Amino acid sequence: MTLTWQGDPIPEELYKMLSGHSIRSFDDLQRLLQGDSGKEDGAELDLNMTRSHSGGELESLARGKRSLGSLSVAEPAMIAECKTRTEVFEISRRLIDRTNANFLVWPPCVEVQRCSGCCNNRNVQCRPTQVQLRPVQVRKIEIVRKKPIFKKATVTLEDHLACKCEIVAAARAVTRSPGTSQEQRAKTTQSRVTIRTVRVRRPPKGKHRKCKHTHDKTALKETLGA
């Protein structure tokens, strides 16, 4: 799969702009990118209010931690039972368009229902027994000639509706005694040794003449000259 670069590269200022404003809907995002100054001020005001509230919440949490630390009795732990819980699912660009890299996806993440929790035995796991596919509409934002272009795209999400602790097939554990392993190694070594028999080929008959052993030089010359 070839990756193309459609549209202009996303400028760094856009990332800074998105990270510096509180965007809760597509309308907020569209007004921000189109340069509505009044709405930008309102978004900045919402951001400051959110920060002020978060600071107050941090102070209350700190006071709560100090009060809990003074107590000597700890509450009993409760098991996280197997059930559906709300989780955050990231919408990556691969789900929208795998052939292009110059675009943004909004919203970048959504909430899904997924099975989670622990069971009473390690041989069982929390798994979904009923699943539902839910299509949602997101925005694909491209920058062409320094102007944002908004396109619609559909992403299919998977929600878990029911969960159950199901048995997981465990891998069989093989136990070997020292004697058995040594015998198997010996058999393996013997099986690896191969004996090869090399046959010596003899020269065929009739190609070389046999010379008779004689002490008579005359007869020897006649034999060689024949």
Curated annotation (Swiss-Prot):
Residues 201-226 are annotated as: Disordered. GO terms for biological process: platelet-derived growth factor receptor signaling pathway; positive regulation of cell migration; positive regulation of cell population proliferation; positive regulation of ERK1 and ERK2 cascade; positive regulation of phosphatidylinositol 3-kinase/protein kinase B signal transduction. InterPro entries: Cystine-knot_cytokine, PD_growth_factor_CS, PDGF/VEGF_dom, PDGF_N. GO terms for cellular component: extracellular space; membrane. SUPFAM superfamilies: Cystine-knot cytokines. Residues 201-215 have a biased composition (Basic residues). CDD domains: PDGF (cd00135). It holds the Pfam family PDGF. Gene3D superfamilies: Cystine-knot cytokines. Keywords: Growth factor, Oncogene. Coiled coil: none annotated. It comes from the Viruses. One of its GO terms (molecular function) is platelet-derived growth factor receptor binding. Belongs to the PDGF/VEGF growth factor family. This is PDGF-related-transforming protein sis. It comes from Woolly monkey sarcoma virus (WMSV).
